[in-house]
Amino acid sequence: MSRVLIIESSARQQDSVSRQLTQTFISQWKAAHPADQITVRDLAVNPVPHLDINLLGGWMKSAEQRNDSEQASLDRSNELTDELLAADVLVMAAPMYNFAIPSTLKAWLDHVLRAGVTFKYTETGPQGLLSGKRAYVLTARGGIYAGGPADHQEPYLRQVMGFIGINDVTFIHAEGMNLGGDFQEKGLNQANAKLSQVA
């Protein structure tokens, strides 16, 4: 049995294309791997606080030095990190907001990219500690940006995943969602075709 962790980050609910992609992924994954455990963390429904002084204090201070706010922030970070550590497969659903990822997803990443936990510093440079995991990134974009200079999603997330040791990363883009007509239909068809090959 494998454990799948899904991170939803779209602010939209019913009309969200990235959420539609997630549901397709879940349906196909369950059909192929009925025994697997799937956990969904919805950052729009339950937002993760952005990196602040309490979280930094929670990381850097000893248990005796932490105040209640710092301890609460550390506990939250530990919960999020433990979910990631336990997962064999990570799925991030990310609409493109202003050429990048939603700030809620960035906040989640800030909680789980932790020295000594998901990566470590060595004499030869940083080393990721999550090797052996797979990641899928499901994106929805109003325009067509893949491979171009305006795409600040894929390069950033590839860098982040590689930094923590996840090098097996598959991106599935639904592009042209705001262009209407044939563009939208083509974008969805291409994304769904790639999803059908995932499981």
From Swiss-Prot:
Residues reported in the UniProt entry to bind FMN: 10, 16-18, 96-99
Record-annotated membrane-spanning stretches: none
Cofactor note: Binds 1 FMN per subunit.
SUPFAM superfamilies per the UniProt record, alphabetical: Flavoproteins
GO function terms (MF aspect): electron transfer activity; FMN binding; oxidoreductase activity, acting on NAD(P)H as acceptor; oxidoreductase activity, acting on NAD(P)H, quinone or similar compound as acceptor
Reaction catalyzed: 2 a quinone + NADH + H(+) = 2 a 1,4-benzosemiquinone + NAD(+); N,N-dimethyl-1,4-phenylenediamine + anthranilate + 2 NAD(+) = 2-(4-dimethylaminophenyl)diazenylbenzoate + 2 NADH + 2 H(+)
EC annotation from Swiss-Prot or TrEMBL: 1.6.5.-, 1.7.1.17
Family, per entry: Belongs to the azoreductase type 1 family.
Subunit structure: Homodimer.
Name listed for the protein in its UniProt record: FMN-dependent NADH:quinone oxidoreductase 2
Organism: Pseudomonas fluorescens (strain Pf0-1)
Taxonomic path: Bacteria, Pseudomonadati, Pseudomonadota, Gammaproteobacteria, Pseudomonadales
Gene giving rise to this polypeptide: azoR2
